[in-house]
Regions:
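Intrinsically disordered, low-complexity, charged/polar segments
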Residues: 2-11, 56-74
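Short, well-ordered loop/turn sites that connect or cap secondary structure elements
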Residues: 20-21
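Short beta-strand-centered aromatic/proline hotspots
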Residues: 32-42
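Short acidic/polar mixed-charge low-complexity motifs
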Residues: 32-33, 53-55
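Short, solvent-exposed secondary-structure boundary/capping segments
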Residues: 44-53
Length: 74
């Protein structure tokens, strides 16, 4: 699904795992949108996500989430 975001950028919903999560992904947690600003590699394929609010979320290797991702076009 693609839709126009603020400023005319294209946004798409994507399924993410600890292997595919990126900085800038927008993940809805508990009904609140959280933007990933940093991430750290952990043991066994897990990653610790840091959101713009300062909150943390650990994604294990088998965790699957849906995120909104801005598509970059150059």
């Amino acid at each position: 699904m693609r839709e126009r975001a603020v400023g005319g950028a294209l946004a798409s919903t994507v399924e993410i795992t600890s292997a595919s999560v990126q900085r800038g992904d927008l993940i809805q947690v508990g009904g609140q949108p959280c933007r990933v600003v940093d991430l750290f590699q952990l043991a066994h394929g897990a990653k610790r996500l840091v959101f713009d609010s300062g909150e943390l979320l650990t994604m294990h290797a088998r965790t699957r989430l849906v995120a909104m991702r801005m598509l970059r076009r150059w």
